Amino acid sequence: MLGITVLAAILACASSCGDPTFPPNLSARVVGGEDAVPNSWPWQVSLQYLRDDTWRHTCGGSLITTSHVLTAAHCINTNLTYRVGLGKYNLTVEDEEGSVYAEVDTIYVHEKWNRLLLWNDIAIIKLAEPVELSDTIQVACIPEQDSLLPGDYPCYVTGWGRLWTNGPIAEVLQQGLQPIVNHTTCSRLDWWFIKVRETMVCAGGDGVISACNGDSGGPLNCPVEDGLWQVHGIVSFGSSRGCNTYKKPVVFTRVSAYIDWIKEKIQL
């Protein structure tokens, strides 16, 4: 049975984690996916940057404490100004009920992030002020250090990424079923081969349902006991041939490989 890591008092920012007030519809199919139930993934955030006096969605992320968001290192450009949208469902509605925008204090990119090889694709955003939790804004659970999920374990990727390769960005939050692909399979020659490291986790690859551009940094949500959810992955990369390419599952940064690093950064 998979345990929920509380990380002592650090990650215990709420009485519970990974427990949405509004449960997701798990029959839904990001590319090939469907609209999520509003606020059913309440730790999902929209990372936005400012250009020409307009805030634009660039990546997803997961709220892991009231002050910290987990995202991908490749989402971060030190020349940009960011804000974090929490409690969001429809990105076209600025003043959406139950949502807030948080300013950013500090961004911690993994010290060994490799932009060429996409190793250590993880970052933590510290918010300028703690956010108030509600039915629409909650913290995610994260797994125990080094825990692994078996092949075909049913997880869900969520985000506002492109609805299909080179297509439009989604207006409302999407979700898609992405079963885990074990490392042995994902590292086969005709899959991802040596590009996939053991600090990564693959999911999907059926050629139908997939994450896409704009989903980067967002969570791979996996069910555990008592109806709770853990974020086991951070959307990192996919195939240059298209977002839903057969035998090219989405590759996620495996959160359980970085628990010690996460704990270190959120104590700063």
Swiss-Prot record:
Disulfide bond entries: C17-C141, C59-C75, C155-C222, C186-C202, C212-C243
Catalysis performed (reactions): Preferential cleavage: Leu-|-Xaa, Tyr-|-Xaa, Phe-|-Xaa, Met-|-Xaa, Trp-|-Xaa, Gln-|-Xaa, Asn-|-Xaa
Glycosylation (residues): N25, N79, N90, N182
Statement: the UniProt record of this protein carries the keyword Cell wall biogenesis/degradation: no
Pfam families linked to this entry: Trypsin (PF00089)
InterPro entries according to UniProt: Peptidase_S1_Elastase_sf (IPR050850), Peptidase_S1_PA (IPR009003), Peptidase_S1_PA_chymotrypsin (IPR043504), Peptidase_S1A (IPR001314), Trypsin_dom (IPR001254), TRYPSIN_HIS (IPR018114), TRYPSIN_SER (IPR033116)
GO molecular function, one term: peptidase activity
Signal peptide residue numbers: 1-16
Residues in Peptidase S1 domain copies: 30-267
Keywords: Disulfide bond, Glycoprotein, Hydrolase, Protease, Serine protease, Signal, Zymogen
Active site feature: H74 (charge relay system), D121 (charge relay system), S216 (charge relay system)
Propeptide: 17-29
Keyword Magnesium (UniProt): no
EC number: 3.4.21.2
SUPFAM superfamilies assigned: Trypsin-like serine proteases
Lineage top rank: taxon: Eukaryota
GO terms for biological process, alphabetical: intracellular calcium ion homeostasis; proteolysis
Sequence similarity: Belongs to the peptidase S1 family. Elastase subfamily.
Summary of the function given for this chain in its UniProt record: Regulates activation and degradation of trypsinogens and procarboxypeptidases by targeting specific cleavage sites within their zymogen precursors. Has chymotrypsin-type protease activity and hypocalcemic activity. Cleaves TRY4 and TRY5 and thereby inhibits their autoactivation.
UniProt name for this protein: Chymotrypsin-C
Annotated organism of origin: Mus musculus (Mouse)
